[in-house]
């Protein structure tokens, strides 16, 4: 089996190393599976936002299925979140946080977890003991369910989870209840 992992793009005319380096049609022709890395919209040096926003993932998939068979596509999504210090400043690094740690942190600081409908992602704000404000975006059962719905909507081969070593019990329960799994290493 030949597989590849490619950056997300939404058109043939996107410029930049991550976009022009990947010919979606060629990957679809020559590969048995293509992982589209639809994560890191929110990343270490970005402003606070969802790591894998469904609205952005949908744009990428709408383009991808015009270039390769959906049955070859594995939807890549994150299994982690980020904790940003506020106010965010250019060049300021966010801290990676596991989904379980994010949920525990929210509970420990009595933060209200909110859900962004467009991104289909969970987030909360809190103030740490030093008086600094934070914003945390992460994946929970609702966001995992929304991403799995994209697999059905586009008729994809399945998913590829980035950072499987970060346990996300709620996400795994949703995955196991909706799909059968095959481990490919």
Question: Which residues does each PLM region occupy?
Answer:
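C-terminal amphipathic alpha-helical "assembly" element
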Residues: 161, 166-185
């Amino acid at each position: 089996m030949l597989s590849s992992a490619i950056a997300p793009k939404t058109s043939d005319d996107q410029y930049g190393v991550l976009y022009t380096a990947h010919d979606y049609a060629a990957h679809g022709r020559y590969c048995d599976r293509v992982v589209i890395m639809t994560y890191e919209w929110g990343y270490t040096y970005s402003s606070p936002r969802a790591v894998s926003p469904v609205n952005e993932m949908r744009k990428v998939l709408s383009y991808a299925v015009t270039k390769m068979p959906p049955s070859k596509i594995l939807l890549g999504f994150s299994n982690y979140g980020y904790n940003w210090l506020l106010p965010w400043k250019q060049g300021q690094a966010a801290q990676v946080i596991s989904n379980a740690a994010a949920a525990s942190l929210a509970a420990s600081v009595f933060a209200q977890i909110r859900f962004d409908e467009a991104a289909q992602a969970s987030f909360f704000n809190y103030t740490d003991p030093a008086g600094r404000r934070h914003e945390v975006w992460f994946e929970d059962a609702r966001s995992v369910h929304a991403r799995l719905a994209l697999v059905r909507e586009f008729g994809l081969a399945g998913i590829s989870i980035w950072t499987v070593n970060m346990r996300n019990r709620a996400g795994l329960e949703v995955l196991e209840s909706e799909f059968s799994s095959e481990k490919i290493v």
